Amino acid sequence: MLNPMSTETYTPTALNFPSLNFDLGETADMLRRTVAGFAQSRIAPMAAEVDRKNAFPNELWPEMGKLGLLGMTVAPEFGGSGMGYIEHIIAMEEVSRASASIGLSYGAFSNLCVNQINLNGTEAQKKK
């Protein structure tokens, strides 16, 4: 199993326990690999410094947006990815695996903010 303090590269197979294989499908597996690669290459190297400075690295937002991680549960007609909560949790797991604090910020933005507008906003708010 991967030691979180280790410098070795994370691959989804590092946590491949047969009893935990939920067979979520190829899309979920591809999403996990993509987000894991991004999180380990971009987020993990800055995680300790982010915690020391107590600041979110704003340059990550556009990068996460390009990956489709912002607005995952929002319908495509409103600019989202149109995915479900399982996919959102997979993204949360991988971002949080690289940095718990960045994962928390991402979760607050993507679920507490964007998702609430998606669920409860007016048509105009959703389009904005």
What are these regions (language model features)?
Residues 30, 37, 42-128:
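Glycine-rich flavin
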Residues 1-27:
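Intrinsic disorder at enzyme termini
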